[in-house]
From Swiss-Prot:
Homology family: Belongs to the bacterial ribosomal protein bL9 family.
Annotated GO CC locations: ribonucleoprotein complex; ribosome
GO molecular function: rRNA binding; structural constituent of ribosome
Annotated keywords: Ribonucleoprotein, Ribosomal protein, RNA-binding, rRNA-binding
Gene: rplI
GO biological process, one term: translation
InterPro entries, sorted: Ribosomal_bL9, Ribosomal_bL9/RNase_H1_N, Ribosomal_bL9_bac/chp, Ribosomal_bL9_C, Ribosomal_bL9_C_sf, Ribosomal_bL9_N, Ribosomal_bL9_N_sf
Biological source species: Rhodococcus jostii (strain RHA1)
Protein name per Swiss-Prot or TrEMBL: Large ribosomal subunit protein bL9
HAMAP family: Ribosomal_bL9 (MF_00503)
Stated role: Binds to the 23S rRNA.
Amino acid sequence: MKLILTADVDNLGAPGDTVEVKDGYGRNYLLPRGLAIVATRGAEKQVEGIRRAQEARAVRGLDHAKELKDAIEGLENISLSVKTAGDSGKLFGSVTAADVAGAIKAAGGPVVDKRNLELPKAHIKATGKHAIVVNLHPDVVAKFHLNVVGA
């Protein structure tokens, strides 16, 4: 079955690519989820429109990502107050990506998706300064330090 991809599909291709897949994969997975359309003459024109729109969106996305990076890195003091287990500095529970996203917003920064945050490990489990990376765009990465303080 010959299809034209409308979205990025792992191990298959990028939007606008014409691919040959097995009938079942196309009919049962790609087409119902809107990841592809059947390759016809009219569909090729539609794909060209999709490509132009994605290129324009990519340019706007890059500019927006750079603005977010400046806003995040411009924040002076991003800190988070959490319950600690005594004087050792260990935390009750842990600090997750969602907590970090909330701390950025509380410090006056932009709203950041928790899936774009890279914590030093899966979770932060101790007080102190921790380096956080925010993947805003494939070409734009913001870095800042989060100060975890015991309450």
